[in-house]
């Protein structure tokens, strides 16, 4: 594994001072050093904001974590059909694929930023930081660490589980941990993060920050993904139901407003982009400039039923003369300050629908109502509950609904791999080995203890 320098944290902290005015007053950047970041509460808070900024880059939610799985799901194209993108669609990913490397490297950079906070904030003297802020900062870092490991374990399977800070001179030779070990740490971190406040001092402080409800929502998703192995569907259903009932989140009538308006009632955790930290994916989705990515056309449109309000927002043609369809969820280009909703209530309804059905052994009124809620917002009629004669039929319907609801959000590929639906509905090579991406070759050269995934 490539070593992750403490200067990654310092760079992120410096950016947080220039662009996170809502969270803290700025300190002269020249006064920030790796040694003094954790000497004061303000310094620790700046490290937390820097950690959030690790999620915004082109190798994270600013592009890779969304667009790469969408290539795997065969939802998008690249204007030049570069092999490093096309290989995801054809399940022929090379071990030196740069986007696989980028996801791995950016993931461990974010984890290192979180580890620094968890370990070093815990070690700060009592006089340097208030007790409530110490707990808050650590729990925020635990959430980001859990979110990042969840993304990595879905992409690569077994990954090294590193929970202490690493420095520029560290020569790590860390083997891969089992999937079960990684999930256990994700769950432990999220259980602790669920103790975060649901509302901070004011709205400005709450926007973009992890809350207790965000941790519970992500934990429900984690339990759903891990449920086939650990039978945690009851926990997934319970947490999803709790978030639906108590978070105050709701689905706006206008589906498109979730992306054209920042921090709507639908959002549970939303990454904040601004003029200093613009959204790379929105920038390269602009059909009036140099769009790099565009949507598959008819194959995507045909997934939606007649009258589905989501279709014409999710994909669109820029002009009648332009045959391409574009990604509608990232259309705020000038400037590209569009936020990214990482967790939203519509997904939680669908998590509840599936988990509750699995728990009940078949579709029930509770699971059906959650499924119907999402379809009602889309303006389409839901088949009668009696039409779902088997559990499998209902789960497939829920997953297909999630695919339409969360198109171009980086979710459908992982969700379909989770149940095997990807084999028939997405994959060019119907081989479960290719549910996972290859461990980057550069990482294996640097760290010979890393094994490669089957099929690569």
Predicted feature residues:
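Membrane-proximal, proline-rich intrinsically disordered regions
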Residues: 3, 20-67, 93-96, 424-456
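Conserved, well-structured interaction surfaces
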Residues: 45, 53, 83-156, 194-202, ...
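Short, surface-exposed recognition loops and adjoining beta-strand edges that mediate ligand/DNA contacts
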Residues: 34-35, 62-81, 162, 198-283, ...
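Hydrophobic-face positions in mid-chain alpha helices that act as interaction patches
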Residues: 86, 235-345, 420, 437-441, ...
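Sec-dependent bacterial lipoprotein signal peptides
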Residues: 1-19
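Long, intrinsically disordered, low-complexity segments
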Residues: 185, 280-282, 293-295, 314, ...
């Amino acid at each position: 594994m490539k070593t992750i320098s403490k200067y990654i944290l310092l760079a992120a902290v410096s950016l947080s001072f220039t662009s996170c005015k809502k969270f803290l007053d700025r300190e002269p950047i020249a006064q920030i050093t790796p040694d003094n970041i954790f000497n004061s509460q303000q310094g620790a808070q700046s490290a937390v904001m820097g950690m959030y900024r690790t999620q915004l880059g082109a190798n994270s939610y600013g592009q890779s974590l969304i667009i790469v799985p969408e290539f795997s799901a065969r939802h998008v194209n690249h204007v030049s059909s570069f092999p490093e993108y096309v290989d995801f669609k054809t399940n022929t990913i090379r071990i030196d694929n740069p986007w696989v490397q980028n996801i791995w490297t950016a993931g461990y950079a974010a984890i290192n930023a979180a580890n620094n906070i968890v370990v070093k904030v815990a070690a700060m003297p009592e006089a340097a930081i208030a007790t409530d802020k110490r707990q808050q900062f650590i729990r925020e870092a635990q959430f980001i660490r859990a979110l990042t490991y969840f993304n990595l374990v879905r992409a690569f399977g077994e990954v090294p589980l590193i929970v202490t800070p690493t420095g520029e001179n560290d020569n790590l030779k860390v083997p891969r941990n089992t999937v079960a070990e990684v999930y256990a740490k994700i769950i432990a971190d999220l259980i602790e993060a669920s103790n975060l406040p649901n509302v901070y001092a004011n709205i400005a402080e709450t926007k973009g920050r992890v809350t207790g409800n965000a941790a519970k929502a992500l934990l429900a998703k984690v339990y759903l993904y891990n449920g086939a192995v650990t039978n945690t569907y009851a926990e997934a259903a319970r947490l999803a139901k709790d978030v639906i009932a108590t978070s105050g989140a709701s689905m706006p009538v206008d589906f498109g407003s979730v992306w054209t308006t920042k921090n709507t009632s639908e959002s549970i955790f939303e990454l904040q982009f601004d003029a200093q930290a613009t959204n790379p994916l929105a920038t390269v989705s602009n059909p009036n400039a140099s769009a790099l990515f565009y949507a598959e056309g008819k194959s995507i449109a045909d997934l939606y039923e007649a009258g589905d309000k989501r279709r014409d927002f999710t994909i669109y043609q820029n002009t009648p003369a332009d045959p391409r369809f574009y990604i509608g969820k990232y259309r705020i280009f000038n400037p590209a300050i569009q936020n990214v909703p990482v967790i939203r209530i519509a997904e939680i309804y669908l998590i509840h629908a599936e988990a509750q059905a699995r728990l009940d052994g078949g579709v029930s009124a509770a699971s059906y109502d959650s499924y119907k809620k999402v379809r009602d917002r889309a303006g389409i009629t839901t088949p009668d509950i009696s039409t779902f004669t088997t559990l499998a039929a209902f789960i497939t319907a829920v997953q297909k609904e999630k695919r339409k609801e969360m198109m171009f959000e980086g979710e459908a590929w992982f969700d379909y791999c989770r149940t095997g639906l990807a084999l028939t509905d997405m994959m060019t090579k119907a081989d479960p080995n290719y549910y996972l991406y290859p461990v980057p070759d550069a990482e294996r050269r640097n760290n010979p203890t890393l094994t490669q995934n089957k099929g690569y």
